[in-house]
């Protein structure tokens, strides 16, 4: 029962993340770089900080925790967060050229596979005494492979969509649709985004041990990863503000109330995925295979729900029933990948 509860919590977080781009559509009169930065303040600073505070027992503080933790682990966690930030920037571009459904599917699929494998591999290189590679069991690799198969099937559906639609229909569904360009960007975004889980692996012991409940133990590391990502994104957004002369966005007081609300909502929905991941892992402590695969499971469910939104937003409008069938098959495979390893 605890395993089911854990997976359900992760699924709720995935649904929230896949919905985070909906409130962004309500933001008025701001350029991309302006609203991306402000929603990032909430998604990568405010809510992760509030989450990390849950891991701090009474009489202690976050400053005490970070000061007493291994400096190498802290800086590696932040570093991989900064690399993940690059993935976040290109992630947005992948959706620009492929749409929400296909863009998230390919990027998150790559992120799921590489993120799950890179974490133990790199941790074993820096700290061989941890024997991190022992986590990569047959069941774990199988889970990753099945996830990637599901992603590949959805990718096939995307290429079928590209081949069957006229240029006018493509532009109607996704304004800047460009499958080859979008595919390359999505793969890069997925590779860099996988660094998030690497950061979590390096920071998994940054907590107060038995004084921190299992469900909150990864939240301090999540804060460090998102902090690194915020720095990367802030630098790029400020650069774009200067390049495009959009500093005036921040001076437009008439839209601040509306935009702040929807940026905060988008940030909360985005952070929900990693808050849910931490809570869900607290119920998976007796299932080591699912613990290792938890990030992969989260990404797989993100893909499932992003495609649900893609259907709702009519991004697959005009596609043949055969294309939709392939898409649904891919979604089913991804759902199966979430619990199949536990049956091995």
Segments the model singles out, each with a brief description of its role:
Residues 1-344:
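Polytopic alpha-helical membrane proteins, predominantly small-molecule transporters/carriers
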